[in-house]
């Protein structure tokens, strides 16, 4: 038996050597090799063609929100560094999600269960991968069908469509770099919409054919401390400033009016103010003729809504912000904001806007105890209007407009009253002044409840949780500057801020607005600007292990259009404000 055993071992060794020689990569476990807190950035070309049969005047949109951000972030990877933990949420992105998963270098069959947005049934994706070739290439094919069990459960829901399709493609993996260097392929989908009645309108069965062509090409592998990352951010800022200047020039050359100052429906003054704020925070000279024309226009407009008034006050305060204040407070050399000294004309305007803003509250509650805002004077409220009202009031207070301490205490009561509590824990936060000294120690502290906030009722979202953190931070800062405030109320507010950061740590993403799946594609850049503001107000550099600024910046770098925009001028202003990291200064309790 010994000669036979030796022969068998020799045969197995030779077979293994041959297999390795033919495809050495296929015998390895593939893993992503990315810098700490870093990521791989890609250039993505996505083409989508849609046909509707029979032709209808109304067909629901198939794709909900922006496609997948063309990047792989180190802190989004599973512990095995073979796949991303972010689930696929859009059929456009199925090819990329399969190609970025490195768990099957030897090829074979596997099944992915994809939870898409509520418009579709959950999908079953049956994948066939070819063996990884010596050059790193690997073929991909898949069939996509509705999960039959889920379809039976949800078959009476008229808002859910059925999707099926096929895709073909290939990826190339560079073992030396530890990254996927390219993805290319195509897919064809058929979407069936059931017939249903909405009001008096009967909507018949609808069918849609979709063809997708998707290409990814590796652009760069970057880390937060790389000079190349800083260079790219600087270029993105430059390009977005140029885009906003171009759009602002066009709009101011026409007849820019306030639409009568309707607080519920007229948002043009607020959009103008947001763009002026972004340009001023980006470092544009106050003496610039375009900026002067924009501010002159803003000063003459009739402004009534809470959003518009809040942002207009922020834009005005930006004219008088000391140029070195942000860096002084960021490094800890300065503890409290410097009082602003606006001109007499601007101070009068700020007082007028502040008076209007203080009147846009919910009239159904005692404003001395509970203060919350809506678009105008109203019997309702929402946390988005409330956040922007408080941003404006805090900026006005920095400019010398007197705000009663009752406004801040009653606002704190509101935010504490409408939290959405979760599990307890200690948020792991690294502060900017510690990181600047090379200290990456996470400050844990006492356990708190993770708390999020919603727009009104419902589940917590990332955009509204950052709003709650920012609002409470500004209210407590104002009370500390005034040397007012009940110590217990301040402590409760500080604990809620820490709870908000714990919620963000537990739900963190820059790919979508965290919270219920249906909210993911909504208000993404609004959320990013809110994330920047919440973290900068509290001088937070790292949320747990996540570098929120690097990840958010990468999301913006790979999605910025060739003309410098991220959509309309409001979206571009939000993107620019995130990249510049110039939130209002706050006096915290630390």
What are these regions (language model features)?
Residues 2-15:
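Bacterial N-terminal signal peptides that target proteins for export
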Residues 10-13, 48, 537:
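General helical structural elements
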Residues 16-24:
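Hydrophobic core
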Residues 27-224, 391:
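Signature of exported/secreted
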Residues 213-590:
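Preference for long, amphipathic alpha-helical scaffolds in soluble/luminal domains
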């Amino acid at each position: 038996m010994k000669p036979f055993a030796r022969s068998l071992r020799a045969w197995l060794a030779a077979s293994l050597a041959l297999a390795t020689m033919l495809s050495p990569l296929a015998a390895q476990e593939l893993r992503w090799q990315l810098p700490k807190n870093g990521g791989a950035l890609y250039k993505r070309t996505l083409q989508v063609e849609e046909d509707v049969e029979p032709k209808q005047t109304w067909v629901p949109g198939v794709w909900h929100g922006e496609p997948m951000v063309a990047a792989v972030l180190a802190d989004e990877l599973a512990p095995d560094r073979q796949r991303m933990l972010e689930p696929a949420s859009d059929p456009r992105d199925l090819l990329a999600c399969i190609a970025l998963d490195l768990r099957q270098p030897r090829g074979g069959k596997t099944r992915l269960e994809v939870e898409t947005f509520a418009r579709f049934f959950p999908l079953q994706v049956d994948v066939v991968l070819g063996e990884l070739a010596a050059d790193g290439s690997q073929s991909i094919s898949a069939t996509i069908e509705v999960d039959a069990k889920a379809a039976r459960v949800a078959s009476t829901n008229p808002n859910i469509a059925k999707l099926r399709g096929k895709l073909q493609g290939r990826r190339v993996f560079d073992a030396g770099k530890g990254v996927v260097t390219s993805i290319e392929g195509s897919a064809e989908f058929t979407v069936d919409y059931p017939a249903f009645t909405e009001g008096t309108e009967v909507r018949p069965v609808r069918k849609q054919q979709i063809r997708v062509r998707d290409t990814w090409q590796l652009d760069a592998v970057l880390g937060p401390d790389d000079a190349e990352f800083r260079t790219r951010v600087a270029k993105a800022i430059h390009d977005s400033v140029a885009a906003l200047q171009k759009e602002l020039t066009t709009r101011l050359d026409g007849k820019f009016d306030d639409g009568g100052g309707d607080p519920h429906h007229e948002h043009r003054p607020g959009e103008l103010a947001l763009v002026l704020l972004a340009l001023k925070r980006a470092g544009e000279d106050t003496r610039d003729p375009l900026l002067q024309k924009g501010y002159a226009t803003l000063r003459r407009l009739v402004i009534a809504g809470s959003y518009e008034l809040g942002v207009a006050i922020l834009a005005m305060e930006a004219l008088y912000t000391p140029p070195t204040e942000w860096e002084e407070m960021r490094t800890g050399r300065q503890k409290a904001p410097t009082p602003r000294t606006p001109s007499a004309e601007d101070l009068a305007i700020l007082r007028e806007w502040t008076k209007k803003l203080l009147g846009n509250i919910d009239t159904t509650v005692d404003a001395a105890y509970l203060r919350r805002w809506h678009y105008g004077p109203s019997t309702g409220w929402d946390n988005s209007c409330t956040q922007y009202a408080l941003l404006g009031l805090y900026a006005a207070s920095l400019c010398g407009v007197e705000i009663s301490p009752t406004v801040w205490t009653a606002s704190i009561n509101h935010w504490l009253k409408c939290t959405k509590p979760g599990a307890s824990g200690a948020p792991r936060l690294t502060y900017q002044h510690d990181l600047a000294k090379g200290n990456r120690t996470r400050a844990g502290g006492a356990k708190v409840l993770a708390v999020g906030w919603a727009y009104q009722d419902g589940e917590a979202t990332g955009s509204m949780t950052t709003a709650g953190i920012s609002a409470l931070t500004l209210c407590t800062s104002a009370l500390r500057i005034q040397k007012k405030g009940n110590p217990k109320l301040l402590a409760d507010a500080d604990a809620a801020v820490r709870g908000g950061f714990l919620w963000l740590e537990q739900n963190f993403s820059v790919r979508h607005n965290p919270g219920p799946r249906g909210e993911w594609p909504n208000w993404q850049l609004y959320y990013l600007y809110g994330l920047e503001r919440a973290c900068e107000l509290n001088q937070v550099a790292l949320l747990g292990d996540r570098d929120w600024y690097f990840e958010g910046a990468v999301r913006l770098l790979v999605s910025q259009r060739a003309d410098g925009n991220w959509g309309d001028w409001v979206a571009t202003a939000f993107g620019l404000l995130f990249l510049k990291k110039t939130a209002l200064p706050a006096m915290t309790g630390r």
